[in-house]
Design a protein with these regions (language model features):
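Short alpha-helical transmembrane segments in multi-pass integral membrane proteins
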Residues: 1-26, 83-150, 196-252, 308-374, ...
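N-terminal transmembrane alpha-helices
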Residues: 13-45, 49-50, 66-78, 82, ...
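Transmembrane helical elements of multi-pass membrane transporters/channels
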Residues: 24-43, 144, 211-215, 219, ...
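Helix-terminus/linker motif at the lipid-water interface of multi-pass membrane proteins
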Residues: 34, 38-56, 125-132, 188-199, ...
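Residue-level hotspots within pore-lining transmembrane alpha-helices
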Residues: 35, 39, 68-72, 112, ...
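Small-residue hotspots at the loop-to-helix junctions and early N-terminal turns
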Residues: 52-63, 142, 205, 277-292, ...
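Small-residue-rich hydrophobic transmembrane alpha-helices
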Residues: 55-119, 152-171, 269, 282-346, ...
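Short runs within selected transmembrane alpha-helices of multi-pass transporters and secretion channels
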Residues: 76, 145-163, 171-182, 204-217, ...
Length: 471
């Protein structure tokens, strides 16, 4: 690794304007996440031309895919945190070793998930109540996606490592390039052309698999040649007990956190479906809008994790605290503004996704009016969660997720919708109430962080002295 590159990137994040540093990291991450959502939009566009069964096949597969991905996402959280702290502490060799260890673990972890997912796919689809006419399409799509999860995990880990080192432009460019390729390959593999056979709905999965493979190889080459201040050495891929323990200790709670959200979403869907088709459709529309709205908050959360991690590693605890506070305030203001603007135009926004469906628009507009003003509270939580992860407090974010989903939101939604006169409105009210309570709880935990005891590099067998700028 070039120490000059590492020093330049790290110094830019350890000094000067915090706001400029947040924008420098956050904006490219936001753009990359928006592009990543383009995969889903492109697949939906072309698969939609195969008919409703093909569209339903992708829809019913998404919860399973999300759950499988959740099982491995903790490794990327651990990678970002440990690399950021090592870079901030000028422990460049250890940053390289962490990168190699996390990438290796992601590959090893993905293999049993891919094998189990392939053989359990029929059972999981039946468990979700997949209709018989949709089942063969869903099975072919799901098996291809699950079989190639090694590439999805691989690129996810590599871009997380780069972000931990402060490099966000290259993952953005790789995502943009593979998105363009996916847009070209989707119609070719779905409908066939010349010697290329028509794979139908499975063609969309094959295109995604190929492009994720290309993205992983590109990311690996970037890190192999040390172009971003971080370098993966193949000789460092042999598991090291202390590093593996640190990665698992940080990563496991993060995986449980995401699984809690995934299962919580399924639990909410169970409540919603019992209230009628129109309510279910309205819920689905608003939840999809929510997923798009929180993209800026995801970017701020990742930027916060990178900046806080590097500053904690460098021993700049007060700057790290200031980063968390400013990031939380910015996320709150931006998402609050988005929510309030959305309220004004909510009937038109909901109507775009549910044209000529007045009851869906009515329910969706009411739901949106209640949840949108609380978007800022979601942004605040996500930003501070980035600070928790950067200081190794993934257990805190896990507990907050479990409390939010299973002790507050779902019981509240059930009670208000079934045992009060609110009815359907009770379901909607559960969201802003939960957001308010969890924002307060998150702030309380953040203000109790002991910043002087947030360094994790000692657990890796690191020397207490800074390593020379050579690797």
């Amino acid at each position: 690794m070039s120490p000059e590159i590492a020093n330049e990137k790290s110094n830019a994040l350890l000094q000067g304007s915090i706001l400029r540093s947040l924008a420098k990291i956050g904006v490219p991450v936001i753009l990359a996440n928006l592009l990543q959502s383009g995969y889903i939009m492109i697949d939906a566009f072309w698969v939609g031309r195969l008919g409703d069964k093909a569209v339903a096949a992708i829809s019913v597969s998404q919860p399973i895919i999300f759950l499988a991905f959740a099982l491995g996402i903790g490794l990327s959280v651990a990678g970002t945190t440990l690399v950021a702290q090592c870079i901030g502490a000028r422990l460049y060799q250890q940053a390289n070793d962490i990168a190699a260890q996390v990438f290796t673990l992601s590959i090893l972890f993905s293999i049993p998930i891919a094998v189990a997912g392939y053989f359990l796919a029929p059972w999981m689809l039946h468990a979700l109540g997949t209709q018989n006419e949709v089942f063969p399409y869903a099975l072919s799509f799901l098996r291809v996606i699950i079989s190639g999860i090694i590439f999805t995990f691989g690129f996810s880990m590599l871009q997380s490592l780069m972000r931990g080192a402060g490099e966000v432009r290259i993952p953005l460019l790789i995502t943009l390039g593979t998105l363009i390729l996916n847009a070209i390959m989707d119609p070719l593999l779905i409908f066939g052309y010349g010697i290329i056979p028509a794979f139908g709905v499975a063609g969309a999965a094959i295109a995604t698999l190929i492009n994720q493979g290309i993205a992983m190889i590109a990311g690996l080459l970037v890190l192999r040649f040390g172009r971003v201040g971080l370098k993966i050495y193949f000789r460092a891929m042999r598991p090291k007990v202390e590093m593996v323990k640190s990665v698992v200790r940080l990563g496991m709670p993060a995986s449980i956190e995401l699984c809690a959200h995934a299962l919580g979403a399924s639990g909410m869907m169970t409540l919603v479906t019992g209230l009628g088709t129109d309510v279910t459709a309205a819920y689905g529309v608003v939840i999809n809008i929510n997923a798009l709205v929180i993209v800026p908050a995801i970017g701020m959360s990742i930027a916060t994790a990178t900046l806080v991690g590097q500053n904690v590693g460098a021993g700049q605890s007060e700057r790290a605290r200031a980063i968390g506070r400013l990031s939380g305030a910015i996320s709150f203001l931006i998402l609050t503004a988005i929510g309030l603007i959305g309220v004004v135009f909510s009937p038109y926004i909901i109507g775009t996704f549910a044209p000529d469906q007045p009851m869906v628009i009515a329910h969706g507009t009411h739901f949106f009016h209640l949840i949108a003003p609380s978007y800022g509270l979601i942004g605040l939580q996500m930003a501070l969660n980035g600070a928790f992860r950067a200081t190794g407090r993934t257990m805190t974010t896990m507990v907050l997720a479990l409390v939010s989903q299973w002790l507050i939101q779902i019981p509240l939604a059930w009670g208000l919708s079934h045992y009060t006169s609110l009815g359907v409105s009770g379901l909607w009210w559960a969201f802003p109430i939960t957001n308010l309570l969890m924002a307060g709880l998150t702030i309380m935990f953040f203000e109790r962080i002991d910043w002087q005891r947030s360094t994790l590099t000692h657990s890796l067998g690191a020397s207490s002295e800074k390593q020379p700028d050579t690797v």
